[in-house]
Amino acid sequence: DQQRNITSFLQIYEEHFDGLGFDGVFLDKIRYGSFSNGLGGVFSCFCPACMKRYQECGIDVDELKHQMGLVRDGAGGYGEQVLGITAYDKGNYTFAHPVWEKFYRKKAEDIARALKTVTGYFHARGMKVGMDTFAPYLAYFAGQDMKRLAPMADFIKPMMYRITNAPAGMPFETDCLIRETVRCNGTQMGMDARTRARKAFFEVLGCHDTG
C-alpha cells in the first residue's frame, strides 16, 4: 500500500532524524522495477489497488495482459521490435499499440503522486529536495517522468553511468531491456537478433550505439 509506505517512511524520519539540522534530503530509488528485474519486474502489478488504478487510467487490463503475453512470446509483431516502439521525443516513447503509453503513464502518475506528498513534507520544513533518477531514455520505463518530477525537486541527478555494468548503469540497463523484450517462441533471442534490435532501438533514440 503506497500511502502506508509513505507514512512509515516519514515516521522513521521524524523519529530518528528530525531536529538534526539537515539542510535537505536526497531521494533515491524512487521508481518502479526496471528490466534488470526481468519482465516480471516491469509487467506488474495486478493487485486490487493497481487494478483500480488501471480502470481510472482507462486501461483495458485484458488487452494489456494480452500484449504482455505477445511480448513474452515474441509474437504479434514484437520479436526484434522493443515493445513495438516507433518514436522517442524528450523522454517519452510512442508505441505501435497505445496500451503501452497508458501503462507507463499510470506508472509515472503513481510515482509523481507519491513524491508530491514526500517532497511537500520536506519543503514545508524549509529543506531542499534532490532526486536520483535513471538516464532519461531509461527513466520512462521505471515510471520516472522528468517533467512531472522537476517542479517537486530542487535538483535532479540522472544516473548517466556510461560504463557501469551494474543496475542503473546505462549499458547494463539497456542490455536488460533488449534481452528481456527481444524474444521468439517464448525464449530470449540469440546475439544476432539482439544486436539488430539494439541498433534499431538506438536509431529510434536518434543516437549512435557505441557498445
Language-model segment annotations:
Residues 1-155, 159-210:
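Polysaccharide-binding and catalytic clefts of secreted carbohydrate-active enzymes
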